[in-house]
């Protein structure tokens, strides 16, 4: 199992040379560190939202909005939480999954893909799914990379909404692993004083 995870995640911090046409490199300051990944073609980044020690920035398919979307890729960060050195990224990923489960306890599914390292920072990948959630009772599945940073917890997530399903959704592991590959390389880097976009120190 451990060997399989190494193979599955060996390219998460690899070169961007094989990035698909139309994709773009995203590197953005988030709560004291730079977070980077490849944004697949067809998505458009929106303005960041910050509130105290929380950060969020979403990207939607062209023509979609925060109120009406079928797919969303997002970066989030949370600071001033208990970043205990003894607690792994898997611990925080489990907390995220538990929060999602409360939204759809009867139709919740989860598929852990396992631990990895992003620039020597502890990270964990998991897929969660709700068969029915929200006022319109749509189905929603999300793949979340949780990174335990120096003083904050970060996530990069790809979520998809589909028509409601009364049962627990069967998670298509192959589909989501392919999407994960579309987002490499993931990066987490220190902020360099005075450095401006495109943040060459984090390439």
Regions found by a protein language model. Name each.
Residues 99-145:
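Signature of long, low-cysteine stretches enriched in small and polar/charged residues
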Residues 42-84:
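Secretory pathway targeting signatures of secreted, lumenal, and periplasmic proteins
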Residues 66-108:
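Mid-chain, structured segments of secreted extracytoplasmic proteins
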Residues 138-155, 159:
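A short, surface-exposed beta-strand/turn
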Residues 19-56, 201:
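N-terminal "mature-domain start" segment
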Residues 2-14:
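Bacterial N-terminal signal peptides
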């Amino acid at each position: 199992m451990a060997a399989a995870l190494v193979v599955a995640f060996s390219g998460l911090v690899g070169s961007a040379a094989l990035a698909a046409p139309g994709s773009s490199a995203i590197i953005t300051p988030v709560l004291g560190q730079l977070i980077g990944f490849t944004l697949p073609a067809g998505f458009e980044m929106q303005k960041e939202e910050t509130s105290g020690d929380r950060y969020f920035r979403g990207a939607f398919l062209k023509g979609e909005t925060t109120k009406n979307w079928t797919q969303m890729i997002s970066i989030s960060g949370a600071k001033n939480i208990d970043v205990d050195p003894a607690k792994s990224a898997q611990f925080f990923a489990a907390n995220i999954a538990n929060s999602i489960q409360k939204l759809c306890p009867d139709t919740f599914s989860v598929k852990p893909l396992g631990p990895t390292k992003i620039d020597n920072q502890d990270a964990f990948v998991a897929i969660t799914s709700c068969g029915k959630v929200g006022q319109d009772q749509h189905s929603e599945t999300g793949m979340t990379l949780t990174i335990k940073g120096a003083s904050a917890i970060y996530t990069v997530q790809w979520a998809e909404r589909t028509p409601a399903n009364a049962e627990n959704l069967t998670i298509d592991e192959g589909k989501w692993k392919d999407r994960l590959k579309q987002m490499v390389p993931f990066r987490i880097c220190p902020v360099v004083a005075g450095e401006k976009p495109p943040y060459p120190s984090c390439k």
